[in-house]
């Protein structure tokens, strides 16, 4: 994993017990319940640490997720839509998070705005199936990706704050 702060954050996220994906009907309902409980705890912990940085919701089946994430840089809030589908082979296969408006703006992204998590995150996910869930995906996948990519994209002038664009 990463630094001590990251280990602490991840240790406070409840691990999941049910090894089930969307094909597993009744077990999937149990897995979804665990996913929501884990996400709620993670968001509560973030709010308590004054580090609230995303919102997620899903369709009724829990197979399509969407929401917003934001990154604060130089006291300016940069907000992005996020989306992902739960793979049929979940939890063995991690979801691929897309940030559509950043599509094509960084080399660390695949077509369609899917962020690159292969080198660092996917091996970690594979070692922790079925304990890791969507809260872990956000904490160890999207969060670090935003922390590296967004300041770089801002510095290069690839993205600008919405208020600066309207002036």
UniProtKB/Swiss-Prot annotation:
Glycyl lysine isopeptide (Lys-Gly) (interchain with G-Cter in UFM1) crosslink site(s): 122
Domain of life: Eukaryota
Coiled coil residues, start to end: none
GO BP: brain development; protein K69-linked ufmylation; protein ufmylation; regulation of type II interferon production; response to endoplasmic reticulum stress; reticulophagy
Keyword Ubl conjugation attributed: yes
PANTHER family: UBIQUITIN-FOLD MODIFIER-CONJUGATING ENZYME 1 (PTHR12921:SF0)
Protein name: Ubiquitin-fold modifier-conjugating enzyme 1
Biological source species: Bos taurus (Bovine)
Source lineage: Eukaryota, Metazoa, Chordata, Craniata, Vertebrata
Gene name, Swiss-Prot/TrEMBL: UFC1
